[in-house]
Amino acid sequence: MKVFLSVLILIFTIQSWTKADDISDFEIEEMSVGESLLNYMDENSIIEKINSKSANYYPNNSFVVFSYKSEKFKIYDDLGIVINPNDKSYIIHSIEGTLYMNDCRDKQLEVVNELKVFFDRKTYEFLSSPNLNYIDDKTGESKVHYEDFYFKDNSAVRVICWSLSKKFLDDGYKNSLAVAANSKYFMNWIKENM
């Protein structure tokens, strides 16, 4: 049985869960890595998404990422979903929930602390990379904070906080908090190809 987890609810309430051994028990807006996207969207909608101008393809069309928004979402403003466009089962290899908010660092640390309780400590390595320069901002004024859970099976969960400069905000970008779950297959592909 899947353990239900909408990560940012953790910010507002305290709940207890069974310790999860891997990311298959981890859900973002009730979706999990390894599930078929067909459980949430019909095939025509998926095809429309992967053929849209806003979809981004990885090298050799191995994967495609697209934004998915739904009024049914309880926590996130939108999701980024990664699938293999040639897989007619449309298995989710990565899912990222994004919440647009200012001053996300404290909330990020709250989420990380709850995830440390949720996941079995023996199954992951934790790496914190706070206050890095955001690669797209050559001035160094925008910062990004990564908090990573690397699992023994090579899957990963990352909690990200973007604190953007005034110029980026004026250009229409938004500060945000994101939680991403990546399958071991996707993580292995990234290591080999990126």
Indicate where each model-derived feature is located.
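Non-cytosolic coordination micro-motifs
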Residues: A20-F63, S89-M194
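Compositionally biased P/S/T/G-rich terminal and signal peptide-adjacent segments
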Residues: V65-I91
